[in-house]
């Protein structure tokens, strides 16, 4: 198998044409329709998926990495990102709720995403491309030899697959796999790429070494961020505006149970994220404490930095007293027994508890977003160590303009000696 190696230093020397094939740059705030009008017949499709055990909030982070890759591709050719349908996530455990093949529009505002990069839903891809076929699937993997000490280099090589493929050929020699729950989807070719580096490292390969019109990158979490914490990162993160119907549910809950509205809380939210540039600390937040208390697998997976329920309640009461707050909103994945114990210890706590009909409508992912939206508007927030759920709340509060001192806080383990608080990643416009 031919080796296709692109070292980071070489990638930096590549001279990309300054404009897309249509003669236009794609920039934040531009409509996808502006650049892609009439281009469906010639544009190429980028698809991706993530390791099945990874959760909702890590997958949102992978989207940001893939968006960087798409921006690199757009400098040379017309590409569009096909949004991977949601479903079959470990943390989505509500029984009797159909939670596969969920389009992104259930959770996010697609026009907002399209102001950053051109995106379409998977079913639109099927309609445009002529059927449920993906020309080339690349399974991303690490290097078998690992990273050796010395100078870090970014590279990508076509290599033999290290692990057994989760794809199998049918009698027509098409590849069958999970494909987001779409059983009719088939891959025409599957091969493995060893990658070490940021997402854009695979751009030369996609542009020069395959003519496939539709390309899927499986195990995309193996790619790193191009510019973590930079303007491009924040442009993409800001574009990930929650779906309006979920925000409205959260806003109604804030108003009814927490005496919180954007006007009263000094939060200047705008529907168009490209026009929303807020000075940090200018927003006050609602008159309540926001809490994310991760339990379940974190109890045994992160024993040192996750408190007991009693320890968590002591910290909550201390914060409420310090900040003169008499309301507390808690987002938690605690099992029923633990939740009942928490309620006894903290009877004044408020929680968003959907009815079965609401759960069926919003699904577990929508409920998680509502929880995050409410926590993001709190006067003061405290989260759980190394939880991506808490990380996403940090980012949302940064976008809304709340004081970082009220955002980057976490619970400490009961016996934890050095309780390092989360790093402040300042928003960049």
Swiss-Prot record:
Disulfide bonds: 161-192, 412-419
Annotated metabolic or biological route of this protein: Protein modification; protein glycosylation
Location(s) in or outside the cell: Endoplasmic reticulum; Golgi apparatus
InterPro entries named in the record: GDP-Fuc_O-FucTrfase, OFUT2-like
Superkingdom classification of source: Eukaryota
Gene3D superfamilies to which the protein is assigned, alphabetical: 3.40.50.11340, 3.40.50.11350
MF terms in GO: peptide-O-fucosyltransferase activity
Active site: 54
Region forming the signal peptide: 1-21
GO cellular component assignments: endoplasmic reticulum; Golgi apparatus
GO biological process terms, semicolon-separated: fucose metabolic process; protein O-linked fucosylation
Residues the record marks as carrying a glycan: 189, 209, 259
Residues binding GDP-beta-L-fucose, per UniProt: 53-57, 292-294, 371, 388-389
Enzyme class: transferase
Coiled-coil segments: none
Catalysed reactions listed for this entry: L-seryl-[protein] + GDP-beta-L-fucose = 3-O-(alpha-L-fucosyl)-L-seryl-[protein] + GDP + H(+); L-threonyl-[protein] + GDP-beta-L-fucose = 3-O-(alpha-L-fucosyl)-L-threonyl-[protein] + GDP + H(+)
Function of the molecule: Catalyzes the reaction that attaches fucose through an O-glycosidic linkage to a conserved serine or threonine residue in the consensus sequence C1-X-X-S/T-C2 of thrombospondin type I repeats (TSRs) where C1 and C2 are the first and second cysteines of the repeat, respectively. O-fucosylates members of several protein families including the ADAMTS, the thrombospondin (TSP) and spondin families. Required for the proper secretion of ADAMTS family members such as ADAMTSL1 and ADAMTS13.
Family indicated by similarity: Belongs to the glycosyltransferase 68 family.
Descriptive protein name: GDP-fucose protein O-fucosyltransferase 2
Species of origin: Pan troglodytes
Gene name for this UniProt entry: POFUT2
């Amino acid at each position: 198998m031919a080796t296709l190696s692109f070292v980071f230093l070489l990638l930096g020397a590549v001279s990309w044409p300054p404009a897309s094939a249509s003669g236009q740059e794609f920039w934040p705030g531009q409509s996808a329709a502006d650049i892609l009008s009439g281009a469906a017949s010639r544009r190429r499709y980028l698809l991706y998926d993530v390791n099945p055990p990874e959760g909702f909030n890590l997958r949102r982070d992978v989207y940001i990495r893939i968006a960087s890759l798409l921006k690199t591709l757009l400098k040379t050719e017309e590409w569009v990102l096909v949004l991977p349908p949601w479903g079959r996530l470990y943390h989505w455990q509500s029984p009797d709720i159909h939670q596969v093949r969920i389009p992104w529009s259930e959770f996010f505002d697609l026009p907002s995403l399209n102001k950053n990069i051109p995106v379409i839903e998977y079913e639109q891809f099927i309609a445009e491309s002529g059927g449920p076929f993906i020309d080339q699937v690349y399974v991303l993997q690490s290097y078998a030899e690992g990273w050796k000490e010395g100078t870090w280099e970014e590279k990508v090589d076509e290599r033999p697959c290290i692990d057994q493929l989760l794809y199998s050929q049918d009698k027509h020699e098409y590849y069958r796999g999970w494909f987001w729950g779409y059983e009719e989807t088939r891959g025409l070719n599957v091969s493995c790429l060893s990658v070490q580096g940021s997402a854009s490292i695979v751009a030369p390969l996609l542009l020069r070494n395959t003519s496939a019109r539709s390309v899927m990158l499986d195990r995309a979490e193996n790619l790193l961020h191009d510019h973590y914490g930079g303007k491009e990162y924040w442009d993409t993160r800001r574009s990930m505006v929650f779906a309006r119907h979920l925000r409205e549910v959260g806003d109604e809950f804030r108003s009814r149970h927490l005496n919180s509205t954007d006007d009263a809380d000094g939060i200047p939210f705008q529907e168009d994220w490209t026009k929303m540039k807020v000075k940090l600390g200018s927003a006050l937040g609602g008159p309540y404490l926001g809490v994310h208390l991760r339990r379940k697998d974190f109890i045994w997976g992160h024993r040192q930095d996750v408190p007991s329920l009693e320890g968590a309640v002591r910290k909550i009461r201390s914060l409420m007293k310090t900040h003169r707050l008499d309301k507390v909103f808690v987002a938690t994945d605690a099992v029923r027994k633990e939740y009942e114990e928490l309620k006894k210890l903290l009877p004044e706590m408020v929680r968003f508890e959907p009815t079965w009909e609401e759960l069926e409508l919003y699904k577990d992912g929508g409920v998680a977003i509502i929880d995050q939206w409410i926590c993001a508007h709190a006067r003061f927030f405290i989260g759980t160590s190394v939880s991506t759920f808490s990380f996403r709340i940090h980012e949302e509060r940064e976008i809304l303009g709340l004081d970082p001192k009220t955002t980057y806080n976490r619970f400490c383990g009961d016996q934890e000696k050095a309780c390092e608080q989360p790093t402040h990643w300042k928003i960049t416009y």
